[in-house]
Amino acid sequence: MSYRELVVELAREHAEALSDALLELGALSVSVEDADADTPDEQPLFGEPGLVPDRTAWQHSRVVALLAADHEPAVLLAAAANEIGVAETPAFTVREVEEQDWVRLTQSQFEPIPIGERIWVVPSWHDAPDPDALILELDPGLAFGTGSHPTTRLCMEWLEQSVKPGQSVLDYGCGSGILAILAKKCGANPVIGIDIDPQAVESARQNSERNHADVTYGLPDACPDGEFDIVVANILSNPLKLMASMLASKVKPGGRIALSGVLARQADEVAAVYARYVDISVWREHEGWVCLAGTRRESH
């Protein structure tokens, strides 16, 4: 059996309504994406910590609908547009999609990822290419962080070079737990992972169990008092700026902090906020993203 994939690019104000209308009219599945993804105009859609995002679609959105082969895309789209009060049917493209073993196809798209000098991130259906390396077994899932994104890679490279056995580490915005797990495998103890998303916390716990990594996870209100040798936060620039005082206060005097989720063009602005508390600069850049790293000044 084959399917049809309908792709429509349109303004934010119509994206969610159109996706709902397409589902009501018989689409098998519909997703809304950033039409500017992987470009300088990409817009992350995350709320500030503890807040709901102020928008639910991107300024330039792409609606992707999977249709049964007997559905006529143009007719369906015209009906959906009429349903939401759009007089003119938006421009669209259609391609045929053959039925496949979707599990096998998805798995084939995720190969082991080498990072740094001795790290491999390995999906569960693959064998580790180098059994003597630092192996993190991690499957793509709901929580952010599998090593494929430049910001995750940057933070992992920094941790590999920075963590010393016995140091305490706080991973704030832990997502899948990948950075916390790596810190533990590098010898850190204790390691704490914090995230605002309960689903991410649960995913991180499961990933740590799979990797035999003793990491404590929780929501922000469970973040322990006290200071850490290392604090790492791979989030986004706005939350990083809002939480600068809190994150810096979690670093021991003389301890180190690494920040990512920051585009190169945002680096100076983020660094300026943290400069009140730590000596910080761009540690490394990769594919337009940066990792900022610094040391908390000693108390006097």
Curated annotation (Swiss-Prot):
Q: Which residues form a coiled coil?
A: none
A Gene Ontology annotation in the biological process aspect, one of them, is: methylation
Output the Gene Ontology cellular-component terms: cytosol
Pfam families named among the record's database cross-references = PrmA
Q: Where in the cell is it found?
A: Cytoplasm
GO MF terms, alphabetically ordered: protein-lysine N-methyltransferase activity
Tell me where on the tree of life, at the top rank, the source sits: Bacteria
**EC numbers:** 2.1.1.-
Q: Which sites bind S-adenosyl-L-methionine?
A: 152, 173, 195, 234
- What keywords would UniProt list here? Cytoplasm, Methyltransferase, S-adenosyl-L-methionine, Transferase
InterPro entries associated with the record: Ribosomal_L11_MeTrfase_PrmA (IPR050078), Ribosomal_PrmA_MeTrfase (IPR004498), SAM-dependent_MTases_sf (IPR029063)
Reaction catalysed by this chain? L-lysyl-[protein] + 3 S-adenosyl-L-methionine = N(6),N(6),N(6)-trimethyl-L-lysyl-[protein] + 3 S-adenosyl-L-homocysteine + 3 H(+)
Q: Which family does it belong to?
A: Belongs to the methyltransferase superfamily. PrmA family.
Question: What's the stated role of this polypeptide?
Answer: Methylates ribosomal protein L11.
| Protein's name according to its UniProt entry | Ribosomal protein L11 methyltransferase
